[in-house]
């Protein structure tokens, strides 16, 4: 029998925790405000990312904070990087904005590195600026650091369900900057044997078949993508494996979700499994709230100290 790994508990706890801290920050005159930037004009991505952005904004408002969503997908491609840089610089300067998310993926013609390099590291809710990213290679503290939201959310789920990572064979499918890459580094530090598979891997089946834990973070469901589609099904895994499904896309025409993991066939073999709805997505949003509170304190320290003028 499969045990479902649900994110609701983490999400509820994070909201309560964030609500308390919003009150404390208000005492020093700071209201957490999250700015989310959407740059992608691809219809699948726009539909998907709009959905995620509005859910995150709703969470922030529910705990007493504020949220703004900036959509830049109508700016002509040749000007989009420049406009995004101008927006990021203005968000960096504004004292009322305490956290920024540049929603991924950004379109291929946008200079993503330049955008993350321009973002103030203390407002970086995703821990994706060059310096924040590098810190992961040193060491991390799951409870106290601003860490990439989805990887940290997944580690919190493992902890909550008592799933051991030390010495386990873990396969991460996907090597994206948002999930696959940071998560594989974190798992390595937790003493797992980590294998990272991606579009150019020569073979995937034998690695997936022998894994104790499979984390699928691809986001190319066969219903939507013809080249390099990916879906994890029950035949591909061994009995008793732990499976975490991360990737998913909204079909812009039907509005329907399509996910990395075939829930039904995988549930027949897995010991633990995240549901496609109510699993990793909620754990991610829990972490967005926690990270926003932390960036808000970082900004509060800067803003408050800049108001103190000495003799
Ligand atoms: N810079 C950046 N930071 C991110 O954190 C980021 C990103 N880019 N790009 C896309 C992914 C994806 N992501 C999700 C957020 C919420 C749900 C979520 O709440 N899902 C609900 C269901 C959604 C629904 O009801 O439509 C659930 O799992 O139950 C899922 C996925 C954040 N991402």
Curated annotation (Swiss-Prot):
Record has Hydrolase as a keyword: yes
CDD domains the UniProt entry points to: NAD_bind_m-THF_DH_Cyclohyd (cd01080)
Organism expressing this protein natively: Pyrobaculum arsenaticum (strain DSM 13514 / JCM 11321 / PZ6)
Superkingdom field: Archaea
Cellular component terms per the entry's GO annotation: cytosol
BP GO annotations: L-histidine biosynthetic process; methionine biosynthetic process; purine nucleotide biosynthetic process; tetrahydrofolate interconversion
Annotated NADP(+) binding sites: 174-176
Subunit-structure text: Homodimer.
Recorded family membership: Belongs to the tetrahydrofolate dehydrogenase/cyclohydrolase family.
Entry keyword Cytoplasm: no
InterPro entries on file: Aminoacid_DH-like_N_sf (IPR046346), NAD(P)-bd_dom_sf (IPR036291), THF_DH/CycHdrlase (IPR000672), THF_DH/CycHdrlase_cat_dom (IPR020630), THF_DH/CycHdrlase_NAD-bd_dom (IPR020631)
Biological or metabolic pathway of the protein: One-carbon metabolism; tetrahydrofolate interconversion
UniProt keywords, alphabetically: Amino-acid biosynthesis, Histidine biosynthesis, Hydrolase, Methionine biosynthesis, Multifunctional enzyme, NADP, One-carbon metabolism, Oxidoreductase, Purine biosynthesis
Molecular functions per Gene Ontology: methenyltetrahydrofolate cyclohydrolase activity; methylenetetrahydrofolate dehydrogenase (NADP+) activity
UniProt-listed Enzyme Commission number(s): 1.5.1.5, 3.5.4.9
Stated role: Catalyzes the oxidation of 5,10-methylenetetrahydrofolate to 5,10-methenyltetrahydrofolate and then the hydrolysis of 5,10-methenyltetrahydrofolate to 10-formyltetrahydrofolate.
Protein name: Bifunctional protein FolD
Swiss-Prot/TrEMBL catalytic activity: (6R)-5,10-methylene-5,6,7,8-tetrahydrofolate + NADP(+) = (6R)-5,10-methenyltetrahydrofolate + NADPH; (6R)-5,10-methenyltetrahydrofolate + H2O = (6R)-10-formyltetrahydrofolate + H(+)
Name of the gene: folD
High-level lineage: Archaea, Thermoproteota, Thermoprotei, Thermoproteales, Thermoproteaceae
């Amino acid at each position: 029998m499969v045990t479902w790994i649900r994110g609701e508990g983490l999400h509820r706890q994070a909201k309560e925790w964030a609500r308390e801290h919003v009150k404390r920050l208000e005492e020093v005159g700071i209201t957490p405000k999250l700015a989310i930037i959407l740059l992608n004009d691809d219809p699948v991505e726009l539909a998907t990312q709009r959905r995620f952005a509005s859910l995150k904004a709703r969470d922030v408002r529910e705990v007493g904070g504020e949220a703004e969503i900036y959509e830049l997908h109508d700016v002509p491609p040749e000007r989009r990087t420049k406009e995004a840089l101008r927006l990021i610089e203005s968000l960096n300067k504004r004292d009322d904005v305490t956290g920024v998310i540049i929603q991924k993926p950004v379109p291929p013609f946008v200079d993503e590195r330049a955008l993350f390099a321009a973002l103030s590291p203390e407002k970086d809710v995703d821990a994706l600026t060059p310096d924040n990213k590098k810190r992961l290679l040193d060491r991390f503290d799951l409870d106290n650091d601003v860490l990439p939201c989805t990887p940290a959310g997944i580690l919190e789920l493992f902890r909550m369900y008592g799933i051991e990572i030390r010495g386990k064979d873990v396969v991460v499918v996907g090597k994206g900057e948002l999930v696959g890459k940071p998560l594989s580094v974190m798992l390595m530090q937790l003493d797992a044997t980590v294998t990272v598979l991606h579009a150019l891997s020569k073979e995937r089946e034998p690695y997936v078949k022998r894994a104790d834990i499979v984390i699928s973070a691809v986001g190319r469901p066969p219903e939507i993508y013809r080249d390099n589609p990916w879906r994890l099904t029950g035949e591909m895994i061994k009995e008793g494996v732990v499976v975490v499904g991360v990737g998913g896309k909204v079909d812009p025409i039907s509005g329907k979700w399509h996910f990395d993991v075939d829930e039904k066939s995988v549930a027949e073999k897995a010991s633990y499994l995240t549901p496609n709805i109510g699993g990793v997505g909620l754990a991610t949003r829990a972490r967005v709230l926690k990270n926003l509170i932390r960036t808000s304190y970082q900004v509060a320290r800067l803003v408050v100290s800049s108001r103190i003028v000495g003799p």
